[in-house]
Structure formats: C-alpha cells, structure tokens
From Swiss-Prot:
Mg(2+) binds at T57. It comes from the Bacteria. The keyword Amino-acid biosynthesis does not apply. One of its GO terms (molecular function) is ATP hydrolysis activity. The gene is ruvB. Homohexamer. Forms an RuvA(8)-RuvB(12)-Holliday junction (HJ) complex. HJ DNA is sandwiched between 2 RuvA tetramers; dsDNA enters through RuvA and exits via RuvB. An RuvB hexamer assembles on each DNA strand where it exits the tetramer. Each RuvB hexamer is contacted by two RuvA subunits (via domain III) on 2 adjacent RuvB subunits; this complex drives branch migration. In the full resolvosome a probable DNA-RuvA(4)-RuvB(12)-RuvC(2) complex forms which resolves the HJ. Its main location: cytoplasm. InterPro entries: AAA+_ATPase, AAA_lid_4, DNA_helicase_Holl-junc_RuvB, P-loop_NTPase, RuvB-like_N, RuvB_C, WH-like_DNA-bd_sf, WH_DNA-bd_sf. This is Holliday junction branch migration complex subunit RuvB. ATP binds at L11, R12, G53, K56, T57, T58, E120, D121, F122, R163, Y173, R210. CDD domains: AAA. The lineage of its organism: Bacteria, Thermotogati, Deinococcota, Deinococci, Deinococcales. One of its GO terms (biological process) is DNA repair. It comes from Deinococcus radiodurans (strain ATCC 13939 / DSM 20539 / JCM 16871 / CCUG 27074 / LMG 4051 / NBRC 15346 / NCIMB 9279 / VKM B-1422 / R1).
Length: 333
C-alpha cells in the first residue's frame, strides 16, 4: 500500500510549468531561476511565507529540480544546536544544492546565529575545545541556496530576514486553480473526475491545495464504496456534506468560532485570548488555522480592540447584520 505522504510526493509537480496557481510568484521565480542557470550560480536564498498547505514545500522541490541540483529537507525544530546545523551543512550539501528549512521561524537562536555566516560567506565557524584553550576553525562550505518556509513571517528576526535575497508570499488558490490540479491528480491516479465535481471540491477547500487533495481522497472513498469509477457533481456534494463542510468550506470548528464571536460577544470586538478560551482553543491556533481563511472570506476583521464579525458572517449564518436571534424571533444588538 502507498502511504498518503508518498502519494502526495508522487503527485507533486516537478516544474514551474506543471505548478498551477501563484502566477505572479511563478513569473518572478521563473526569471530568477533562468538568470541563476545562465550565470551558473546558486539561486539567492529564498524565503516563502503564507498559510499552511499552499505549496511552499512543493516550490522548494521545484526550485531544486529546475536548477538540476539535490535538495536536503529539514525543519526549524530539528535544528536546536549549532552541531545539528553543522552536520547538515558539512555532510549533506554539494555545490549549488538547495537546503529547505520548513518552519524556519522555530530555528534555535544560537543555531540561527551560526547560520548567518553560512548564508552570507558560505563558511562555518566551529569552536573546538572549551575555556581558554578553545579555538575556532573556519570550514568552507559549497555555495548553496537556503529556501526557508514559514507561516509566521513576523517571528523571523530582522538579521535573518535581511539575508534572504528573495522573499515571496503565497496566496490562497481559486476554486478553478484547485480544480485544474485535482483533475491532473485524478488522471495520474487512474480515476474519473468531472470538472464540476473538481470545482465543487475546490470551492470547499479553503483555498488550500493540501486540503483539496485530502478532500479528493475522501470523496473518492465514497465513490469507490458506491461502485462509481467517475466522481460526479452529486457524489462530490453528497460526500462533502457528510464531511461537515458547508458551501464556503467552513467546518464545525469554523462555525463555532463565528457563532461564539456573534452570540457570546455580540459580534465583537473581543480579544483573541478571550475568544480562544471560550472555544477551548489556544490563541496561536486561532491566529494560524482559523482566522486567515475567515479574513480572506471577509467574515471577520482584526482590529486594535479585537476580533469583529462582519455583515458577511451574519449573512452566512442566517442572521441579520448586527443582530442575534434570541430564539423567539427577536433580534438583539
């Protein structure tokens, strides 16, 4: 059997041409890659940021493939000490290779400081011994490209940010872009997917390719059990409804967020910590998981005084703007 992560890797586009969406970023990245190839140089260090599941890891692999080099994948939490970093830089990289660090904002501070000369001068300072007898030796490194990915760019320190020559933001995908990608996946996996069904899955995927691919697998499960070799619109709608996703892609947790904000806090403003406590979540989860998509839909606003529900949120939940149904047909402000 093929594990989902191996399946995702097999379906991952290898080139910028195969990659669907992020058109502005692709245009710029295409120029940078062509220039680097023409000069036979490593690509400038690149920082990719945006919500989870938008393709930062995929783009890192595409960069390596387009440059014809190897990629070494690690994550910020895995690099706690300078020794962890030294092992990666000295044992795993060859000239021009790509080092991809996911969640780079979680890189240990001491390790981060040792990364600066590696990024800037392609050298690594190693301290041998302790106390007065300690001495520093300088190890030359191959010229490599660091690709960092983060969902929290505000946590990237200024010294680290300044060492990236390319900094790009990934946007949410349209339903059409997601459908195009899902149709490709279905073709590669050998089952049918109607375009309307692809659009339906795309519309309920929170603009996120990773979620769309997960939903496609679940919808396919329902189709397989029903003995269907092609996923049509009705099957997609039925399966997605059973998965608890509404027409905008909101699940029960998203609705709980909005309903708590509206019913318990009169639509806001309310602080994120208070709201998190009310729905038994932590504030970081709200900020990283729930809120980006709700803001994208125009359902909430972040204000200096706290979170506020918009008229679109009331409308989506079937409530008149600014009012709350008390259960007796009376709307309270």
């Amino acid at each position: 059997m093929t594990a989902p992560e191996n399946l995702d890797a097999a379906l991952r586009p290898k080139t910028l041409t195969e990659y669907v969406g992020q058109e502005k970023l692709k245009d710029k990245l295409g120029v940078y890659l062509q220039a680097a190839r023409g000069r036979r140089e490593a690509l400038d260090h690149t920082l990719l940021f945006g919500p989870p599941g938008l393709g930062k890891t995929t783009l890192a692999h595409i960069i390596a493939y387009e440059l014809g080099v190897n990629i070494r994948v690690t994550s910020g939490p895995a690099i706690e000490k300078p020794g962890d970093l030294a092992a990666i830089l000295t044992n795993s990289l060859e000239e021009g290779d790509v080092l991809f660090i996911d969640e780079i904002h979680r890189l240990g501070r001491v390790a981060e400081e040792h990364l600066y000369p590696a990024m800037e001068d392609f050298k690594l300072d190693i301290v041998l011994g302790q106390g007065p007898a300690a001495r520093t030796i300088e190890l030359p490194l191959p010229r490599f490209t660091l690709v960092g990915a983060t969902t929290r760019p505000g946590l990237i320190t200024a010294p680290m940010r300044s060492r990236f020559g390319i900094i790009e933001h990934l946007e949410y995908y349209t339903a059409e872009e997601i459908a195009t990608n899902l149709l490709r996946d279905a073709r590669l996996l050998g089952f049918g997917l109607d375009e309307e069904a692809g659009l339906e899955i795309g519309a309920r995927s929170r603009g996120t390719m990773r979620i769309a691919k997960r939903l496609l697998r679940r919808v396919r499960d329902y189709a397989d059990v029903a003995g269907e070799t092609t996923i049509g619109l009705e099957r997609a709608q039925s399966a997605l409804d059973k998965l608890g996703l509404d027409s905008a892609g909101l699940d029960d947790r998203d609705k709980k967020y909005l309903e708590t904000l509206i019913h318990r806090f009169a639509g806001g403003p309310v602080g994120v910590d208070t709201l998190a406590t009310a729905i038994s979540e932590d504030a970081l989860t709200l900020e990283d998981v729930y809120e980006p998509y709700l803001i994208q839909l125009g359902f909430i606003k972040r204000t200096p005084r706290g979170r506020v529900a918009t008229a679109h949120a009331y409308d989506h939940l079937g409530l008149p703007p600014g009012g709350i149904d008390d259960g007796n047909g009376i709307f309270l402000n």
